[in-house]
Amino acid sequence: MRVFELRLALLTSAMAVMTVPSQAVANDSAANAEASSVRAGSRQFTPDFFTTYAPVTALDMVKRIPGFSISEGEGRRGFGENAGNVLIDGDRPSTKSDDIWTMLSRIPASQVEYIELSEQAGADTETQGQGQVINIVRKRTAKVNGTYEGTIIAGTRYGFQPSLNASATLRRGETSYELNVSSYSERVYGFGPEDFKTGSAVLLERRFYNGTGGHDQAALGGAIKTKLGDSKVNLNGQVRWDDSFDIREADYFNGSGVDTADELLLRGGPVSDISYEVGGDIEFSAVPKTNTKIVALYRSGHESAYSSIEIARMGQPVTLFETRSRNTPTEAVMRIQNDWSGLGGHAVQFGAEIAYNRLDARFSVANSVAGAVTSFPASDVLVQETRFEPFVSDIWTLGPSWKVEAGAIAEFSKLTLSGDSIAERSFQFIKPRAIATWTINPQTTLELRAERQVAQLNFNEFATSVDVTVGNQVDAGNADLVPEKTTTFSGLIRHKFLERGSIQFRGDYQLVDDTEDLVPITVRDSNGNITAQFDGTGNIGKSKRWNAELEITLPLDWLTRPIGFAGIEAKYIGHYHGSKVTDPVTGLNRRISHRPLWHQQWDIRYDMADLGLVFGASFSVQEPNYAYFLNEIRRQHEGTRSTLFIEYSKFSLGTLRFQVTDMAGFHRDRYIYAGTRASGALDQIVNRKRTLDPLLQLTLSGKF
């Protein structure tokens, strides 16, 4: 039924585009002064194109480019492979801590000269592997310019939480100085029951929870961009503070409704943690027809967390379970890339990247009953990885309509674990890639690609942790974890219409080796006897994945202008994610854990440019998420998240936005089996429901 509903939604959306009057579609071929094609596969957007939307920042402008979505990489290994599809003044920022959304929000819309969109293979050497890239080109001015944004988030049960973001840029000749400060504060109030039942669904106990959680963050960053002779030099840095908390209380009732116990949960993480990053690059030409860029990056910090859960049952001693963790991650990267244009019709890039990653993870657990404390052995693990990656690629222009990018990366890496887990492994991978794009006409692009990818390891999976919210469930560190390898074949077709409209369909098929999923982790004594079994992230062999994405942006002026108004735009994004893997516990085929089958989002906005008003709404929903543990199947279903907003852009101090968000609560169902899932004997059912208070948000944003 759900699959039918998904197909119906996709079909309905596609039909909406097909029913657009043919005359309106034909108008797209007319010349457009605000968004002109500068070469095949490329389009330039001047500020006039965005006037209707009254943008404050470059991010506001990028969001309105037809058929374009920001990509920040896909969790692959290496700095180069995680290149996004956004450039600023032709450069990729030499940072991993600052996301591109934040960086674009610091650029005033008034300082954007134009935005160029390229939609061909090898669209830019700075973003190899991306078939669609935008470049935000800023004006050169000696004036100080910047952006500011102040927000108050309010809830009915926790008051007001303010946040502030500001940035400023100063240019002096060939040098620019950038400074940015930001803060963020959020509170969420949640409540709802959790029912514990027998395998035959007889109620044993009901727990009613209510609690408040929050996250606070502050950051200070800056950058200097200059020229030394003919060389371009960029330096950047950031320091960030993070803190969060979760306080939850519960009353326990038996199946007859009698109050039997009280619970208090305290949890935090990060806990006033400080992290920092410094990076930079230098770009120069040492030999004719060759451009060289050297990138260096270093980041480190602390990641701490704590949790405690105290339960007082009638007539029984008070129990207290506590955990503490303190992790120190470190990363250092250096990359040199050379772009050679000495062969007509080709753009060759070659170079190498070297990286060092380190995680010092410390974890402890203690349990007390009636004040008597039992301390468990601490889990201390040091994970270190060194990686060397030479690479080469060639972008071949076959004509005005065809471009091909082909390349390969070789990886040589060594991973060591010491402390409570001891292991050492070496990896060698070849990661080839081929992309071809055909610009069928100025409105239509076809992209085909085949590539081999290696996923980035999450070093935290080598360390042990405990989730006190689901019965003190242990996530055991796995010293045998190796990177997931994926071979992907994909295709994409994109069509633009009505000047601001677009439809895009993407599909891919993936063959996966060493699939990452939940696996049973066995603990043995010195004699080889099993002492315990836990769940943890591990590799479960080969799997297959297939994905589809439909994105439609539909301006409705062709429909509404005949009846006297214009400015309504609708957008739909639908994702489908299929998968098949052999379960390590049952031996049967199933989907991969933590991979919802589908996700859909609908957006609609009405821009009243003359009045400076915008009305809008957004709705998103996804299929339940499943996870497969040793003795449990866990199903979590989040509700529909809805947002309504109104903006006024003619306020003297900037743009005012009032927003109401109906937070998506969730239902979590745990099906716990006697022994393992392979037994098929259902022992316990746990149903949890959480409802969240809506959020009210008032934002003032402006530029100077």
Predicted region positions:
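Surface-exposed extracellular loop regions of Gram-negative outer-membrane beta-barrel proteins
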Residues: 302, 360, 414, 424, ...
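Outer-membrane beta-barrel signature, preferentially recognizing the C-terminal barrel domain
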Residues: 273-275, 327, 381-385, 425, ...
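A beta-strand signature from Gram-negative outer-membrane beta-barrel systems
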Residues: 109-145, 560, 703
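N-terminal periplasmic accessory domains that precede
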Residues: 58-61, 102-103, 128-150, 162-164
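Face-selective signature of the C-terminal outer-membrane beta-barrel domain
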Residues: 221-242, 269-423, 439, 547-573
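Gram-negative outer-membrane beta-barrel transporters
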Residues: 508-511, 530-625
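C-terminal beta-signal and adjacent terminal beta-strands/loops
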Residues: 648-704
